[in-house]
């Protein structure tokens, strides 16, 4: 006998009961153990930062990471689901700096020391928020928290060391001087994709955009006009660049002669001038100019060029004068300087201050020097014009300090060498939505610079390189290899312990220390497929058993971040895609369309809504929304709440009706019973059920939850508003046709069981509650995915039922237009059809008569008819 069901269901209370049942009976563990070890479906979870608090974004990412493992488990696959924590990097360091009252990187070493600072970082990341488990439980996600890996674990860090070694040996890693984004507060390079992840990492400002006069060395009163947005960088200008293909002019204005690109004459002051010469840019190449500041002249080595005009295709006439200043603090600038043999001078220290040896400006923060440089050059008659330019500047993703481009002698992944392979392997990946594949992701790969993977910080995996002054390097790929080379037992790979490990140079015999940098934490994230399993050191599984993983999912910001670094490392190590299928979610914005922020007060508290409406409603809301098609949405409590009114209560009411009358009629399912009903409603709903099985299966396999939710909603609506509505008189004490009653209960029971299975990945709590009462089985999540039964599919019957429902809908509309209430019976209705063959059988006519409360149906044929009347 079924347990009684209340029509007034409290979904959050029900979910608490289900959670307790799952934990007590270890249903999650059984769902894994019940599947064969030799049939695996793998997914890789991007670990959140260990001390961060859950929010709608993390919940959004977590939900599909539960949906698809549930689906593939029911399909018969063993799905490993282990949680992970991201521990290293600036998020922890910045928090510890604040807790210790430190205001700069320099104070870390001077005031507290690296050892204490690292100890504080370890303590900080050990404080795992208990909130995480509450949230993950209450959105219905199954995951192994007990065996969670951490990126700070020795085993994880050893695999990262191995990954570095593999890439280094394949000549994909090099050390060199290149320009990258730099944070003067954190005193470290910042990855360009870290900034690109979030629009809040950019700030709109109005900045300097000045035109400077550089006197040509051998031409009297002749200046070349150069444009720049960085006055602080004018302190060191060892070269100017022009475009050889552009046409330049020499003009005479106010007794001085100026050279600039002809298309930029509008940049001249509003003073009369005349053009006295016109020539191609090639004529300017090699000419010398007088520098504005000469303090670094003694640093210029023999063979190096300085104060010379060079050519560059990167110079355009779109902005400025067609002439740009060249210094080491620009990617194209530095590349041109290396190519032309220009002297490289760096005048900022690691905190963004001008070095003390620089006259007039030494010790100033670089931005503070802007105004003083402009004033000095203006006083000396070298500032032609000063303008303002509104533009967007990047900010540090952790401390929000304004970034600048700076030359870094650092460790890089040679993306240019890898790029053809990266583009090729992307073709093998299934992206959903598909437009990201050759759209945003491919474009990010095509435009990617070499990746700076070293950081001038402390809390992270070490750059595993011991570099001798003679140039020899030792790059271990394992702890064992390092122990053998050093003779020291390794218990911790963190600073400062790792910095005390010495090895002997095989070339010259000197004692060698490790280079001081740590690795970008993104290389740890990109190594997750291997490092979470401590591959290749614990060979419990073959590589092909887990790599590339079948599935990953994150929001659009990870296209240029986690997806990208996974792709780079997968291609570099194995010339393989790093994942087979990727689901890209959109972003959940606040109610006002801005990023969700406590300061804005523009979003409802997720915990409060989970307690109020439950986890299934949140899952339905998000899984059925455009956010699962990579589009951004505004958070809406109303849309969240509407899921209860929609699918959930609709299904519950059908279930409640079935249980109520089954108890009244003392009906119980019979083992092995087959449904051979002749009732057209039973045949129709079972035929439609097979279409639902087919469509949901295909949509799950294509990672399209929006279609799954839509198909479930449509079917449950048909079940409630047509099948149950038209079948109410088939059950209960007044229904005397026992055969028909048995058919109804058997059909309804079969349909509800199947719906529970199909919806289990979407609404795991509701499906579990219903399924456990319908069956004697332990859990719907331990059952097998339903197979489509083509024998009961009847497309002609479905077409006739659709026609029937359309007629009914039209009839209701006519009643409404004419203000005729349904309870008022009508003698007859007239239905005009185009062909006699469209006339429905008596069974369908009976449905129309009962639904529209009419006694007789009259059919009329009109071959010129466009639609049924």
Label each PLM-derived region with a short phrase:
Residues 19, 168-198, 271-272, 284, ...:
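Amphipathic alpha-helical
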Residues 37-45, 67, 104-108, 133-140, ...:
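Active-site-adjacent bridging/hinge elements
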Residues 102-119, 431-434, 607, 628-642:
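Short, polar/flexible loop-turn hinges at active-site or ligand-entry regions and domain interfaces
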Residues 57-69, 76, 85-86, 151, ...:
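Structured ligand/cofactor/substrate-binding pocket environments in proteins
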Residues 378-399, 499-517:
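Short acidic, Pro/Gly- and aromatic-enriched capping/linker segments at domain boundaries
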Residues 177-179, 236-239, 407-408, 531-533, ...:
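Short hydrophobic alpha-helical segments that form membrane-spanning helices or hydrophobic packing faces
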Residues 1-255, 326-339, 343-358, 380-422, ...:
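N-terminal, positively charged nucleic-acid-binding surface of large information/translation enzymes
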Residues 211, 443-523, 527-529, 535, ...:
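Feature 926 captures the class I aminoacyl-tRNA synthetase adenylation module centered on the KMSKS loop
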């Amino acid at each position: 006998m079924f347990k009684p069901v209340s029509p007034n269901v409290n979904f959050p209370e029900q979910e608490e009961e289900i959670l307790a049942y799952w934990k007590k009976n270890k249903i999650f563990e059984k769902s894994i153990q019940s599947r064969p070890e030799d049939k695996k479906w793998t997914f890789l979870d991007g670990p959140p930062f260990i001390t961060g608090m859950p929010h709608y974004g993390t919940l959004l990412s977590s939900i599909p990471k539960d949906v698809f493992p549930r689906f593939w488990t029911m399909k018969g696959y063993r799905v490993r689901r282990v949680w992970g924590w991201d521990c290293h990097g600036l998020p922890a360091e910045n928090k510890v700096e604040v807790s210790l009252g430190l205001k700069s990187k320099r104070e870390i070493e001077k005031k507290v020391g690296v050892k204490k600072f690292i100890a504080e970082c370890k303590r900080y990341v050990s404080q795992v928020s208990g909130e995480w488990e509450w949230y993950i439980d209450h959105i219905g996600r199954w995951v192994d928290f007990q065996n969670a890996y951490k990126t700070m674990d020795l085993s994880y860090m050893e695999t990262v060391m191995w990954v570095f070694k593999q890439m280094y040996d394949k000549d994909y890693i090099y050390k060199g001087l290149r320009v990258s984004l730099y944070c003067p507060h954190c005193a470290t390079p910042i990855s360009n994709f870290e900034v690109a992840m979030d629009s809040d990492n950019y700030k709109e400002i109005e900045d300097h955009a000045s035109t400077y006069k550089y006197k040509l060395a051998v031409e009297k009163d002749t200046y070349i006009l150069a444009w720049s947005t960085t006055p602080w960088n004018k302190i060191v200008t060892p070269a100017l660049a022009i475009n050889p293909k552009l046409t330049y002019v020499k003009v005479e204005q106010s007794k001085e002669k100026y050279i600039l690109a002809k298309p930029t004459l509008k940049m001249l002051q509003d003073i009369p001038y005349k053009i006295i010469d016109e020539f191609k840019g090639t004529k300017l190449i090699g000419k010398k100019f007088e520098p504005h500041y000469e303090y670094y002249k003694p640093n210029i080595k023999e063979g190096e060029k300085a104060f010379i005009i060079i050519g560059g295709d990167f110079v355009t006439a779109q902005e400025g004068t067609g002439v740009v200043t060249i210094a080491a603090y620009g990617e194209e600038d530095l590349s041109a300087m290396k190519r032309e043999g220009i002297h490289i001078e760096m005048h900022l220290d690691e905190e963004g201050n001008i070095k003390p040896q620089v006259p007039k400006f030494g010790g100033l923060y670089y931005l503070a020097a802007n105004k003083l440089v402009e004033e000095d050059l203006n006083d000396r008659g070298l500032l032609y014009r000063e303008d303002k330019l509104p533009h967007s500047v990047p900010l540090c993703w952790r401390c929000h300090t304004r970034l600048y481009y700076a030359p870094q002698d650092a460790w890089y992944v040679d993306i240019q060498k890898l790029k053809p392979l990266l583009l090729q392997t992307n073709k093998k990946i299934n992206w959903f939505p598909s437009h990201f594949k050759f759209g945003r992701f491919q474009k990010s790969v095509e435009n990617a610079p070499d990746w700076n993977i070293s950081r001038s910080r402390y809390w992270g995996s070490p750059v595993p390189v011991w570099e001798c002054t003679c140039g020899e390097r030792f790059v271990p790929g394992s702890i064992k290899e390092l122990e053998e080379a050093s003779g020291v037992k390794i218990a911790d790979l963190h600073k400062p312990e790792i910095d005390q490990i010495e090895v002997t140079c095989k070339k010259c015999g000197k004692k060698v220390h490790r280079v001081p940098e740590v690795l970008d934490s993104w290389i740890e994230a990109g190594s997750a497929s291997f490092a979470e399993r401590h591959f290749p050191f614990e060979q419990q599984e073959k590589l092909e058993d887990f790599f590339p993983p079948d599935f990953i999912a994150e929001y659009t910001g990870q296209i240029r971040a986690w997806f990208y670094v996974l792709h780079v490392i997968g291609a570099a190590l194995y010339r393989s895609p790093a994942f087979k299928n990727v689901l890209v979610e959109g972003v959940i914005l606040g109610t006002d369309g801005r990023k969700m922020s406590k300061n804005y007060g523009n979003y409802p508290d997720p915990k409060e809504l989970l307690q109020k409406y439950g986890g299934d409603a949140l899952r339905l809301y998000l899984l059925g929304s455009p956010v699962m098609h990579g589009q951004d949405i505004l958070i809406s409590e109303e849309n969240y709440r509407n899921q209860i009114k929609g699918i959930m209560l609709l299904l519950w009411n059908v279930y409640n009706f079935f249980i109520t009358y089954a108890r009244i009629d003392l009906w119980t399912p019979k083992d092995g019973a087959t449904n051979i009903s002749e009732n057209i409603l039973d045949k129709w709903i079972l035929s439609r059920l097979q279409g639902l099985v087919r469509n949901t299966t295909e949509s799950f396999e294509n990672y399209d939850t929006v279609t799954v939710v839509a198909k479930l909603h449509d079917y449950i609506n048909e079940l409630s508003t047509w099948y149950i509505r038209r079948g109410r008189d088939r059950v209960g004490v007044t229904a005397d046709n026992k055969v028909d009653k048995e058919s109804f209960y058997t059909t309804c029971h079969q349909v509800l069981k199947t719906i529970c299975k199909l919806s289990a990945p979407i609404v795991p709590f509701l499906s579990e509650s219903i399924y456990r009462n319908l069956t004697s089985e332990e859990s719907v999540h331990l059952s097998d995915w339903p197979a489509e039964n083509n024998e009961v599919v009847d497309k002609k019957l479905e077409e006739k039922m659709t026609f029937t429902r359309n007629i009914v809908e039209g009839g209701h509309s006519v009643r409404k237009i004419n203000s005729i209430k349904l309870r008022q019976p009508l003698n007859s209705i007239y239905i005009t059809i185009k062909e006699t063959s469209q006339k429905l059988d008596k069974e369908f006519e009976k449905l129309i008569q009962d639904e529209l409360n009419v006694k007789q149906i009259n059919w009329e044929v009109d071959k010129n008819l466009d639609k049924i009347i």
